[in-house]
Amino acid sequence: MAKKDTTPMMKQYYEIKEQYPDAFLFYRVGDFYELFEDDAIKGAQILELTLTHRSNKTKNPIPMAGVPHLAVDTYVNTLVEKGYKVALCEQLEDPKKAKGMVKRGIIQLITPGTMMQERPDQAKDSNYLTSVISTNSGFGLAYSDLSTGETFSTHLADFEAVANELLSLQTREVVYNGHLTDLNKDFLKKANITVSEPVEVEGEHAEISYVAQNLTDDAEIKATKQLVAYLLSTQKRSLAHLQVAQSYEPTQYLQMSHTVQTNLELIKSAKTSKKMGSLFWLLDKTSTAMGGRLLKSWIERPLLSVTEITRRQEMVQALLDDYFTREKVIDSLKGVYDLERLTGRIAFGSVNAREMLQLAHSLGAIPEILNALLETNNPHLQNFAKQIDPLKGIHDLIVNTIVDNPPLPTTEGGLIREGVSEQLDRYRDAMNNGKKWLSEMESHEREVTGINNLKVGYNKVFGYYIEVTNSNKSKVPTDRYTRKQTLTNAERYITPDLKEHEALILEAEAKSTGLEYDLFVKLREDVKKYIPALQKLAKQIASLDVLTNFATVSEQNNYVRPNFVTDKQEINVVNGRHPVVEQVMTAGSYIPNDVKMDQDTNIFLITGPNMSGKSTYMRQMALIAIMAQIGSFVPADSATLPIFDQIFTRIGAADDLISGQSTFMVEMSEANDALQHATKRSLVLFDEIGRGTATYDGMALAGAIVKYLHDKVGAKALFATHYHELTDLDQTLKHLKNIHVGATEENGKLIFLHKILPGPADQSYGIHVAQLAGLPHKVLREATTMLKRLEKQGASELQPASEQLDLFVPEEASAPAISDDEKDVLDEIQNVYLADKTPLQVMELVAQWQQELKDKD
């Protein structure tokens, strides 16, 4: 960086900037944070700031832009959300007391993975910083949400597994110690993940050993220590709220790749990337932010343990059966703030008095929740309540210390209740007496001078003063008043008495404000001792929130409690419904369908027209399984399910983010993933496998995949296809059954029944679907002609191998010569649906056709 200004302040700036070249340096100057040089130019553009210059009189003025210190969080968040890092450089001493240049230093490096200030619409989102260690045995991965302190670790075999985990976590930043290939770099760039280098921290830090204390895997230990070291380095403070890392194996949960989660729209709509339209959107009626985050994590990691699932189900059933208790709990939960993140801010030292009261109010709601649960006769609700410590002592400590409506700043006084500190009360008495004296002085001076609008005021530059308008200057007693400031319409004066009392008042105010801040810090440190207890309470309340939410959603949507079979792989879902689709349809219009697969049936081969509901039926099965394994009730009349260990999907056409593969290559890769890793306890959904290549290649591949699933894998599979030739496989594959989505034709129009029926579909209705999509009549007519020719010529095995199936031969010579325009009119006549037309409308149509034929002559 070219150093254009070597004044002491800018010299200090350059020295600090050299330490953080990849970050925006927010440099505190008075009430502003300033950006200089390239930071100012780029920052002004991104943040829409006015770009000015320092040292304008020199040949090379320095670009400069600033933001008020009270609004800095907004600007920092904007930069960090765009993937940048921000170094906050603060004044480390009172400028009034500084000898020479004010000491400054970085108090925090804010990065995409360490941002704690979320927007209101992000309250139910986690922000994970992830650490990855490359070892000879694979990769150690650890991640933490700094705002809550929760920390997890695992060991993964290869970078593809790491990439999948990063995408599933929606991590914003990864600390990585290894070499990145160009392919890996490309993936991280496409995924908008910031890559940061590991750092080493000097000295011993209790947090590092504390967080990793329960880990046994060497790669996980290294990844976790690397994670905590990076957090300590960037945050530059104690991080007492970081929780002991929980080690997990992906195989502990129902495994679903990021692609599967995307295809099934678990967290976001695949079309809009928004919450609306996803399973999370449907199920999320939680009352607290921490409940919403927990629900999301449950959806992403369904359980495998029937015991754990049943424990959740029992709570949901109890809350579903007891409406009044449930409503009491919900009402009380609405008064609970984000305990997890409040606890994090307390540990972080950034909590203010209002947030401290939010913690107290949240704790105040806990006894109401416990009473509601304990007053029931249900042992599950009672036992849950008995495990909760309401932490009444913390609640009482806060409400007895902080005033009811404290100001936002913690350094300007007005925080602490009267009676908390005798010394503080004495300072306040002195302040009050001084202000009383000022009021009396103002009245006295008005009386003795005859200036009725004389007033006593205060500002930070001159202190207390007496202000007199210009029209009354002649009445000023010059022997006692000393002029201090001239304004446009008034003069300001001081007197010896005023300055004497000013010193007393300001001294009392300064001491009072300082003592209040000290008392607030003491309160914060006292509460900090209870961080583990607060974190445990937060998890319990979040869990109750999710389970109560399940009961509410189940009641609203008429869900049923699923049963599980563990000794055999059987599915028996009666009148199952797609939970999201039914919500966006008119009430009662959704057509439910059964899924019944006994021990002798592993594969459903599904045929039927496009748009008829094959994909919906398949997704419906997967979502019901996921809902069941997170402890939710499910959309069906009844449901008996096995415990699935993995779900694989090949649904939709999208290129691959991780490797940049084409759609067909992605299709084959995902099919291979299922064929290689699925077990008899897995659920496989394949939709239109083989459509990305030539017809016979695709048909051959699809048939071979079905056979491999049947003979080698043995998983429960729903296989939708447009290759009707595959329906003959039920003759040789005894565990395969044909089903189809019903459709019928009425007056030349295709009617979807959306009902699953036994056996294969008799035709595909592809041209009818194209008609529904609005394709031109000429295209539809040409397609119909080709279809008839194909049906007449038959399949390829009836022709010599060297002969191409000629679709584009001319019409038979005997066909009457009809122009294309005339054919268009004939098509309109053939396709018009007369049943919904009045006689007058029919007459108008006939007249229109007659005119069209005349115009074409």
UniProtKB/Swiss-Prot annotation:
Keywords: ATP-binding, DNA damage, DNA repair, DNA-binding, Nucleotide-binding. Coiled coil: none annotated. Pfam families: MutS_I (PF01624), MutS_II (PF05188), MutS_III (PF05192), MutS_IV (PF05190), MutS_V (PF00488). GO terms for biological process: mismatch repair. The keyword Phosphoprotein does not apply. GO terms for molecular function: ATP binding; ATP-dependent DNA damage sensor activity; damaged DNA binding; mismatched DNA binding. InterPro entries: DNA_mismatch_repair_MutS, DNA_mismatch_repair_MutS-lik_N, DNA_mismatch_repair_MutS/MSH, DNA_mismatch_repair_MutS_C, DNA_mismatch_repair_MutS_clamp, DNA_mismatch_repair_MutS_core, DNA_mismatch_repair_MutS_N, DNA_mismatch_repair_MutS_sf. One of its GO terms (cellular component) is cytosol. ATP binds at G608, P609, N610, M611, S612, G613, K614, S615. This protein is involved in the repair of mismatches in DNA. It is possible that it carries out the mismatch recognition step. This protein has a weak ATPase activity. Belongs to the DNA mismatch repair MutS family. HAMAP family: MutS. This is DNA mismatch repair protein MutS. The lineage of its organism: Bacteria, Bacillati, Bacillota, Bacilli, Lactobacillales. The gene is mutS.
